[in-house]
């Protein structure tokens, strides 16, 4: 029987140690905290819309398992990335267990609660800053901060659960569609969502207290 490099008993401990090194939202992966839209905007270094073009995985020289994602950026609401750019980042964890040269199996797959990335999917992502010690990166709020776009509708892996809970914006700043969206459940109109996020960032609503 092949050896498993991280056993069933040791895996939670090894995972917790690795996530602690990543910092930011990854450090809370073992106890995923619900975050709403205001928190996702505030915690993100960049907010991008685009398409996933490549997904691979590997093990870094320091032994850290990663999934490498390349995206084509269509638009950006926050940060230095611009439409037309290609962006590549690495997220903690493998796509699937990997057979190592010594015959053991590295079972450090992407942890539950992290976003999944698939070639061809369109998305809006609230990207947290890269971890200072490892360079690994994921989304603010983990899977809450990556929303897939399909047939003009947008939702995250939790069907937008809690995304608008507690979000407060003066009615005078909102369109009728935006007011309806903030009180809705499940997938919402992608154009309305992206438009609201863009105006919130451009208008600096969170810093001015207009969005809470």
Residue map of PLM features:
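Cleaved targeting-peptide boundary
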Residues: 27-36
